[in-house]
Design a protein with these regions (language model features):
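Beta-propeller domain segments
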Residues: 203-208, 212-214, 224, 293-463, ...
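Conserved blade-ending motifs and adjacent loop-strand segments that build the rim/top face
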Residues: 346, 458-480
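Surface-exposed, charged secondary-structure patches
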Residues: 24-26, 57, 61-62, 67-113
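Short, low-complexity N-terminal intrinsically disordered segments enriched in polar/charged residues
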Residues: 18-45, 50
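Short beta-strand edge/turn micro-motifs at domain boundaries
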Residues: 113-141
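Beta-propeller fold detector
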Residues: 131, 152-155, 191-199, 255-264, ...
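Bacterial Sec-dependent N-terminal signal peptides
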Residues: 1-23
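Acidic, Gly/Ser/Thr-rich repeat motifs that build Ca2+-stabilized beta-propeller blades
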Residues: 100, 140-293, 351-354, 359-363, ...
Length: 503
């Protein structure tokens, strides 16, 4: 009996030695709302009921008439049915204070857009919808031919901006590759430099051939509560050269405080290209980021190419927890693999984006001579570089020796011409309703903006926009209210709103 007790105690101690990742309050609220979405979409009254507190009341005002339902009256309206193919859902915003919260959600059907505002509360049993108000807006009928693209410059004077994130509809953070991290009020154009950036930042030498500087700025999913932001940049180390570094900081009083280093893509090298630096939070709450291979030409590849070497941090995509620890469910690449690996075979990926209706992550990849790609991120995927490319090698004599047993993930799209794709974004909104769930991709080479229509993981069509008004585009984003913006990569960089002049 003593042996049995000892084994149990040791087993319990073993498992307790590994930290268990608890869901955040935001993730718990998202789970509650997902129950509501799933029940609403399929008529499952049990799931709708699970999301709502017993005291929940539901209200709307329609055609001059006030309507109110109790929880039981509301769930009594649901009858089981198949999920409509053209139904989509999204959480627009969540705000949390202690055990209270509010959320705005949207449910889009073939004919209508339903917008609900939830008040939520946390009890001993979890988060519940305490009450909701709702409205219904019929979709306007749009045709691609009814779209008239227009540009409106909102902000200029940016020093090769690399990334933008919205704190609110009218306030943004912008990282300038050759300048500062700035907070900007889009209404009065007031620009404030964020102080406290790490002193190991390697400055750009200027010019299109130097990728060095500041890269992505990203808000924590719980930013309103914890004030965490994440930054990627080129960091220097004495005579060793430079590399990509990922940090987390608290944004307080226009300053970076409590800086924590999450990742350093060692080794440092003297090259000034292909840092990667794209970052994204997935729907799983994990931080994904890209690290470039850091070579300009293939002739400098070692015997085991950098992007194929699981012991080398370069040329990879990573998945980590927001505090820098490694998730237990990451793919296994081998005992010697660098921690946090999620995918390998990456050359110079910069853009990451989340497909809202599927939770898939898509990314853009730069080829060496043509070979620019769009990929879907797969756990454990090997995207082939430099063993294979859809383009050509810059060093024509390069012939990589095959690696026995390797299999490679094919891109979902590649261009015949050089595009240099950067920040990409799935559009969801009403201003360009015909573009819903289309992928918008900015390009640096020759200045381009692309619209790709998608079915599952297949590109069905492509359209190049603004062909007579080209601009080096670094980022495509939407504001919290759905306005579409592009960020231009110029010495006089601009934040430009893309508008539909037909409305």
């Amino acid at each position: 009996m003593e042996k049995v007790v000892l084994i149990i105690c040791l087993t319990a101690s073993f498992f307790s030695a590994f930290p268990q990742n608890s869901p955040t309050e935001r993730q718990l609220i998202e789970s509650t709302i997902q129950n509501y979405f799933d029940g609403w979409a399929t008529g499952d009254s049990t799931k709708v009921s699970k999301a709502m507190h017993a005291s929940c009341h539901l209200k709307n005002y329609n055609n001059g008439k006030f309507i109110e339902f109790t929880k039981n009256q509301y769930i009594g309206l649901f009858k089981p049915h198949a999920r409509p193919a053209n139904l989509s859902t999204r959480i627009v915003s969540i705000d949390i204070t202690n055990n209270m919260g509010s959320a705005k959600i949207e449910i889009s059907t073939a004919k209508d857009l339903f917008t609900d505002y939830f008040n939520l509360m946390k009890t001993n049993e979890g988060w519940f919808i305490a009450d909701k108000v709702s409205t219904r807006t019929p979709h306007k009928i749009f045709d691609v031919n009814a779209i008239r693209l227009e540009k409106e410059t909102i902000l200029e004077g940016l020093k090769r901006p690399w990334s933008i994130v919205f704190i609110s509809e009218d306030e943004v953070l912008i990282s300038e590759k050759e300048g500062d991290l700035v907070k900007v009020n889009l209404l009065n154009k007031e620009k404030t430099k964020i102080k406290g950036f790490p002193t190991d930042l390697e400055d750009s030498l200027g010019g299109f051939g130097d990728n060095t500087g500041k890269f992505e700025v990203l808000l924590d999913p719980d930013f309103k509560t914890n004030k965490f932001i994440y930054l990627s940049y080129a960091a220097k180390a004495a005579t060793k050269g430079r590399t990509t570094k990922i940090i987390r900081a608290v944004l307080e009083n226009q300053s970076l405080q409590q800086i924590k280093v999450l990742f350093v893509a060692e080794p440092h090298t003297h090259e000034r290209v292909h840092y990667g630096g794209g970052m994204l939070f997935g729907n799983d709450g994990k931080l994904y980021f890209t690290i470039g291979e850091r070579l300009f030409t293939e002739k400098d590849e070692p015997s085991i190419p950098i992007a194929q070497n699981i012991e080398d941090k370069r040329g990879k995509i990573y998945r980590i927890n927001s505090d820098g620890t490694i998730p237990n469910d990451n793919p296994y690449f081998g005992d010697k693999a660098t921690p946090g690996l999620y995918a390998i075979g990456i050359r110079a990926a910069q853009g990451l984006t989340l497909e809202i209706n599927t939770s898939k992550i898509w990314f853009s990849e730069h080829g060496t001579h043509q070979g620019d790609e769009i990929n879907v991120l797969k756990a454990g995927g090997n995207y082939g570089w430099p063993m294979k490319t859809t383009g050509k090698y810059r060093f024509a004599e390069f012939a990589p020796k095959p690696i026995l047993g390797n299999t490679y993930t094919e891109p979902v799209w590649s261009w015949l011409q050089t595009v240099a794709p950067t920040g990409l974004h799935f559009y969801v909104g009403q201003e360009f309703a015909a573009w819903n769930h289309n992928l918008l991709v900015g390009g640096l080479s020759k200045g381009s903006l692309w619209r790709l229509t998608i079915e599952n993981e297949t590109i069905k069509s492509t359209e190049e926009l603004f062909v007579n008004d080209r601009l080096r585009i670094r980022k495509v984003v939407q504001s919290p209210m759905g306005k579409l913006y592009i960020l231009s990569d110029e010495l006089n960089g601009k934040l430009i709103r893309v508008k539909n002049g037909a409305l």
